[in-house]
């Protein structure tokens, strides 16, 4: 007999065990454990805060698409992506257990960044210096160069002062070139346009929206028992947690518990636009539950995990599609209609323009 019940013994089990254990993420900043191999020397990723969604009209440029060359309406997600501050360089050496950090060099952290809210920032000389890293690079001991960066939420629309600190790999083939680039951007701000190109395929990682403690029906998708099968008029539970022998409950049995607030990565999203003026994409009245995008932004085709104001990490795709279009797409229109449920009164110039007449000077 299969894994199913008495009525349908051959059906697959309810829910997936691939994401076990389904527990809360340890912190709101997702971890990136793999990086793409590429020749371009750059910081392999950026981070922004999810502002909301809207829609855009663009020319479909995917090869062999049924609507290739035609206008299509697509959903887009707006990430509020203020510049990030490069705070430190880390050098990694290979060991039998993987890469291990051998030393790091910190820049002078500006007080307005308020990184002391996160941890005690190392003083000069406490955690190594650039000369030591350079020696290890010349000796061939160091094979991996990464940078520690911090977001600047004060420049975004999120109500927080504490920066989010994370680590990004420096891409490239030659370790010396990667180290020199890291030294060049140390103690400097990097922007989204310095990392990504419009039209690039990327992966996005985030912590999903938390749902709290939920039962087995919502958590695992088990069937609600019918009226005659229920015990004590309660049908939102599993019929059996296992046989008498073995006298233990297996870990695969659906149980109630945490739903949401898990780290998830969605692959092969496309960056449609990178801009410097958030007014270009902010709806009238601002994004609901977020506000106004004031500066740099990233517009991604489709959805990304997490609620509004959640940190979203973006990196170059590790397995990009082979037929992906190259270059920036042609965007004809970005919807800025109010999401507040209130339609603003059109100005005289807008009315004249809609009627086809010349606008006033």
From Swiss-Prot:
Job description of the protein: One of the primary rRNA binding proteins, it binds directly near the 3'-end of the 23S rRNA, where it nucleates assembly of the 50S subunit.
Transmembrane regions listed in the UniProt entry: none
Molecular functions (GO terms): rRNA binding; structural constituent of ribosome
Any GO CC annotation of this UniProt entry: cytosolic large ribosomal subunit
The protein's name: Large ribosomal subunit protein uL3
Listed GO biological process terms: translation
Compositional bias annotation for Basic residues: 1-14
UniProt keyword annotations, A-Z: Ribonucleoprotein, Ribosomal protein, RNA-binding, rRNA-binding
Pfam family name, one: Ribosomal_L3
Entry-linked InterPro entries: L3_arc_euk, Ribosomal_L3_dom_3_arc_sf, Ribosomal_uL3, Ribosomal_uL3_arc, Ribosomal_uL3_CS, Transl_B-barrel_sf
Region (Disordered): 1-33, 337-361
Subunit and interaction comment: Part of the 50S ribosomal subunit. Forms a cluster with proteins L14 and L24e.
Family of the protein in this entry: Belongs to the universal ribosomal protein uL3 family.
Gene: rpl3
Cross-referenced PROSITE patterns: RIBOSOMAL_L3
